[in-house]
């Protein structure tokens, strides 16, 4: 990710390091020597944008969901603001962060307000801004100079959701077996049989009896794993394991 950013913005200063090694002080404490060094190097900061690790609050995480040590890194955004004092702040995460067992989002909001920031918090769905996918994310907007509003963002930039067909219909004519990006994968025979079953029976959700044992007749949240996307609707949230 950093290499891509550096290619897009030549000459920009890149720092690849854990945030807690740069801002190592406790909230409410005086700036540490390391923090003062970072501040001197940064100078004035107009906008700070942060996306703390979301795995610990993802609904797809069945191991450390809502109680992951990495969730505490959300609070490093509050410490950054305390030390650097950026004029505007944007924090993005999965909606599950709002239900973290240690209330990292709520504690961050309280700290930002104590620092004099005006806040607007809420959940936005990209399909409400013209995307062809359902993807909800928690946003925190904070500013020292005005009252931010997620509602205004919805009003100014909201748009009708686009369909899956709008995004990928052209791929039907773009198949190139010699191209990594334009060639379909070769599913295993069992997977191909399930795919054909959906189309042959005009179904969008694979019946339990057609699923493998690990996802058969169980109370799970992976319904779409063996489903078919609706061409005339936005896609469900696409994950790396889709």
Model-derived features with residue positions:
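Short alpha-helical segments and helix-capping/turn motifs at coil-helix boundaries
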Residues: 29-35, 123-127, 221-224
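Conserved beta-strand scaffold positions in the cores of enzyme catalytic domains, especially
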Residues: 14-16, 119-123, 237
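Residue-level detector of flexible, active-site-proximal loop/helix-junction positions
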Residues: 19-23, 126-128, 175
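Extracellular/periplasmic catalytic domains that process cell-envelope and extracellular macromolecules
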Residues: 40-42, 132-134, 229-232
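Core alpha/beta nucleotide-donor-binding catalytic domains of modification enzymes
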Residues: 1-85, 95-99, 106
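Conserved Class I SAM-dependent methyltransferase catalytic core
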Residues: 72-142
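S-adenosyl-L-methionine-dependent DNA methyltransferase catalytic core
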Residues: 111, 137-242
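Short catalytic/ligand-binding loop motif for oxyanion handling, primarily in non-cytosolic enzymes
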Residues: 55-59, 97-100, 130-133, 147-150
């Amino acid at each position: 990710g950093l290499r891509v950013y550096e290619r897009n913005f030549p000459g920009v200063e890149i720092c690849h390091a854990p945030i807690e090694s740069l801002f190592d002080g406790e909230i409410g404490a005086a700036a540490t020597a390391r923090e003062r060094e970072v501040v001197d190097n940064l100078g004035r900061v107009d906008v700070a944008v942060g996306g703390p690790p979301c795995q610990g609050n993802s609904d797809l995480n069945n191991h450390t969901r809502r109680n992951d040590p990495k969730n505490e890194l959300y609070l490093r955004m509050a410490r950054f603001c305390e030390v650097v004092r950026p004029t505007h702040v944007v924090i993005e995460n999965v909606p599950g962060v709002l239900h973290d067992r240690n209330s990292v989002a709520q504690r961050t909001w309280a700290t930002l307000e104590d620092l004099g920031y005006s806040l607007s918090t809420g959940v936005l769905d990209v399909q409400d801004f013209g995307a062809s996918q359902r993807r909800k994310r928690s946003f925190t907007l904070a500013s020292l100079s005005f009252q931010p509003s997620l509602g205004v963002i919805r009003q100014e930039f909201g748009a009708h959701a686009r369909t899956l067909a709008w995004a990928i219909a052209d791929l039907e004519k773009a198949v190139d077996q010699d191209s990594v990006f334009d060639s379909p994968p070769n599913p295993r025979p069992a997977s191909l049989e399930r795919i054909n079953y959906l189309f042959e029976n005009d179904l969008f959700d694979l019946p339990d009896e057609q699923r493998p044992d690990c996802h058969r007749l169980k109370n799970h949240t992976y319904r779409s794993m063996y489903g078919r996307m609706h061409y005339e609707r936005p896609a469900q949230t696409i994950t790396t394991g889709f």
